[in-house]
A protein has these predicted regions:
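N-terminal regions that are enriched for targeting/export leaders
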Residues: 1-89, 94, 98-117
Length: 117
């Protein structure tokens, strides 16, 4: 079976002893599951936020959704600019379940691109 071409950079050639500076970042992305759907069905809190924009800070639902897919824009951009970004991304199962349930292919597609291409 032929292996697909990779779009990402190869493993780093940087040697730890030669680095003068570095930056570490880890992002934890999460949205809880809440019993707020029809008849108390479980839904993503992000979905609840989108459906109730006038409660609390729920008006921020779409910016949150943008953050969940943003890494798939930033990382390829940094690679194109000649950088070798390294980042740990931690997306909770609840968040992934919720965005799939909501049909947010903009998010799942971006994450699939980031993880698999």
């Amino acid at each position: 079976m032929q292996q697909p071409a990779r779009n990402w950079s190869s493993p780093t050639t940087h040697r730890l002893k030669d680095l003068k500076s570095a930056f570490a970042c880890a992002l934890h992305m999460h949205q809880p599951t809440v019993p707020a759907g029809p008849d108390g069905a479980l839904i993503s809190h992000l979905q609840y936020m989108l459906e109730h924009p006038n409660e609390g800070d729920n008006h921020n639902a779409e910016p949150f959704a943008h953050c969940y897919r943003r890494m798939a824009e930033l990382i390829p951009e940094l690679i194109r600019e000649g950088c070798s970004p390294r980042i740990m991304l931690d997306y909770s199962g609840n968040l992934l379940w919720g965005v799939v349930q909501m049909g947010r292919e903009d998010i799942t597609g971006a994450l699939h691109h980031l993880a698999c291409d």
